[in-house]
Each structure stands twice: as structure tokens, then as C-alpha cells.
Amino acid sequence: MATSHPDPTTSRHVAVIGAGAAGLVAARELRREGHSVVVLERGSQIGGVWAYTSQVEPDPLSLDPTRPVVHSSLYRSLRTNIPRECMGFTDFPFATRPHDGSRDPRRHPAHTEVLAYLRDFAKEFDIEEMVRFETEVVKAEQVAAEGEERGKWRVESRSSDGVVDEIYDAVVVCNGHYTEPRHALITGIDSWPGKQIHSHNYRVPDQFKDQVVIVIGSSASGVDICRDIAQVAKEVHVSSRSTSPDTYEKLTGYENLWLHSTIQIAREDGSVVFENGKTIYADTIMHCTGYKYYFPFLDTKGEVTVDDNRVGPLYKHVFPPALAPSLSFIGLPWQITPFPMFELQSKWVAAVLSGRVSLPSQDEMMEDTKAFYDKLEASGIPKRYTHLMPDDSQFEYDNWLADQCEYPRIEKWREQMFYIGFKRIYAQSSTYRDNWDDDHLIVEAYDDFVKFMSSYQELLPMLKT
């Protein structure tokens, strides 16, 4: 079965759902390709997850489906775990701004600097004029037009002006995946009397003063939050499934922070028993256990499902074969350098919608996707890691996207900087943000940046000394 494509250089009316980093660059690329774009954003500002709020949800575990949802999961102390040079969009560098004293010049800046960068990006490319703020998408579904095998998309949205139904040629989903928490499954937890919270609702450590806290998870948020809490807590115990069962060690530089293996059982007397045999009486368990992909507004009649955190079937993590090219997803992969990938995915989607780039047939896309899933299964990789891109896979994917669009491949300095930085996180988790040994790559980055912003020319002599 052949996949239907727009005529070459066709302009489409496109709804972009979300005005975070993915939605902003999707809007830019779609408009660059000649499409008419409306960005629907439920919040009052751009930035998505990077728009910090001190507000948290009333349900600390975010289990109640009727709860008022807070989109952002940022904690106040968060700094980027990726160097700013490799984090930015390819043609809009995320470089320091030496003449603006209000900005954070650090190489791993605070979340406020990332939001400021996204605002700069939106201003530079006049993106906000395409955004409808405080507009929540209630439903998006395909509707058949008379005489057409495949229809357009009806998007129902709600704002202070009421509910609106609109018809679009295509929908690009950019609503992020850091809002709907995943939780650890702990034997006996229903009878355990202590408090539980997911990191989605963590902002500051004050509430944990003098407590014994167990932090489940040792990825980015777990590493940061356990150290944040250790400043005020009596004890902090980190449970990590990536350690051996007998693990029990005090973390360097802390007198009240220990690393354990997984939890064996939680008991009604308030104790928690680890696989290493240690028993801890804890006040609070903090779940730093990641998030679920969640699209409550999207009705695809079963063509796209979320199964154990696999969104699929999706060709190259973007297009559902049965609904391509009118439905696409930007930003699903993780453990990546996100903004450049969002940009390349957006270029691909925009070019496919205009007809400048063609997709394989529906059958060929399904065959490719099934082969990818079969490869994961044969390697023993669980479904929940479908969109994880470890090792070289993210840059192979980025370069594949670039080739589709006849756009330059990812710079070698950017790849090397990511790899070195990623290794540094685990080798020196407490200090990696302020100690590094890849200055030569910083110089290469700024050599590239001057092609886009001549104001960085003055920084080069300082960087090279």
C-alpha cells in the first residue's frame, strides 16, 4: 500500500501541540517550509518543562487522574547536565552572553538560562505570533473528508473563550514527556506508613529537614535530588537497580548519603529492607523513577498506542505508518542532546508535509518499524526502553534525519562533547558541572558559532588562551 504524499511544495495548515523546545522549533521549521502554523499551548508562556514553577500537585505521587496537573517537573536547584555548547539548536547557538549581566554564564547553567535561551529563540524567529496561550487541546482525531481515503484532523481546544473545533491538514505532537510520573513497584508499600512523593512534585529540600529519606533511582534527577536533600536531611539512602544486590556504600563527600541496591520490601512498622539486607526506618520515599508518555487528547482509533512506555508503531520514532504524514511526534527519544534532535525531526516532518521529501510506503514503514522492535526484543531490551538512544545511536539517527533533509550532519565536536560530558557525569557526579577537560571542543564550538552570530567573534581569543 503506497503512502499518500502532499504535492511537492504544498503548503499545509498544521497544528503544533505544545510550545516547549520541540514545539518552538517545529513551528519554525514548518513555517520555513511554507506551512501555515498554529501552536496550541496550555500554559501562559513558552518553554514547556523549562518554565519553572514553585507550584506542585496536591497529590504528591500524581496518581489521581482528576488532579490539577502541573506541567513542569523542574526543581529549583536544577542545572543542565549537558554542556550548553552542544545543547543548543544547530543554527542558534546556546552560547554565553557576556554583555548581559542578568544571564547565567556557566557552562552548565541553571534552568532559568535555558528558558531565557528559548525566549531568545522565539523572539529571533517571531514564533510567539503563532502561539495561542492558555489553550488546552481536548481532542485531536482524524476525520474523513468526502471522497478522500484519509481525512484531515479535527482539533478541539479549550480556552477562556470557550471550546473551539478546527480542521487542520496535519497535527504535530510536541507535548513533552516529563509530566505523567512512573512509580517504583515495591512489595508491601500499601501498608508502609511513611510519606511518598514523586520527583515531579519536588522543588526544594526544606520539607525533608532532619528526616530519613529513601530516593529510588540514580539517573539524572535522582543524582541531583539526593544530594540536594542531603543538605538538610538526617540520612539519605539511594536505591539503584543498576548496582549489584550487595551494594552498600557511603558516597564520597557526604556523611549522610548511602547507595544501596533495590528495595526488597516495605513493612508496616515503617522499615524498608534492601536487597543487601540493610533495614532502614524511613520517613519518606522519593520516587525519581521517570515518566510515562501520555497523550490523553489523541484519538487514533488504536493506530497509535502506549504499551509499557513504547509509543507505537512509529517509523523512526516520528510517523505512525497508518497515519503518516498527517500525524507526527517530535521529541520522544531520551538520553540524548535534545534540541538538535528536535530540530532535525522537525525539518524532516516539515519537508515530508510539503512533499519535498517522500516517505516509504505504509507497508515498508511498518516492516522497518517491526524489524527495529524485533531487534530490541532479541537483544533483551524491554519495551520501556524503545525510545532510549544509548551510545552512538542518537547521532546515527540525527545524521540519518539530516541526510533525509539534505542538511549538514551533526558536528563532530558536538558528538565528542556529549560523550565526554556523559562519562563525566558518572565519573564525578558531584563536580562534573564545574570541572572539565574538553576546552579544545569549546573552542571548536565557538569557531562554528561565529558563522551564525558574529558577536561571538570577540570571545574566541579569550577561549584560545
Curated annotation (Swiss-Prot):
List the GO molecular function terms.
Answer: flavin adenine dinucleotide binding; N,N-dimethylaniline monooxygenase activity; NADP binding
Name the cofactor(s).
Answer: FAD
Record keywords: Nucleotide-binding included? no
Give the EC number(s) listed in the UniProt record: 1.8.-.-
Provide the binding site for NADP(+).
G217, S218, S219, A220, S221, G222
Q: Relate the protein's function as given in its record.
A: Catalyzes the conversion of methylthioalkyl glucosinolates of any chain length into methylsulfinylalkyl glucosinolates.
| Protein's recorded name | Flavin-containing monooxygenase FMO GS-OX-like 2
Organism expressing this protein natively: Arabidopsis thaliana
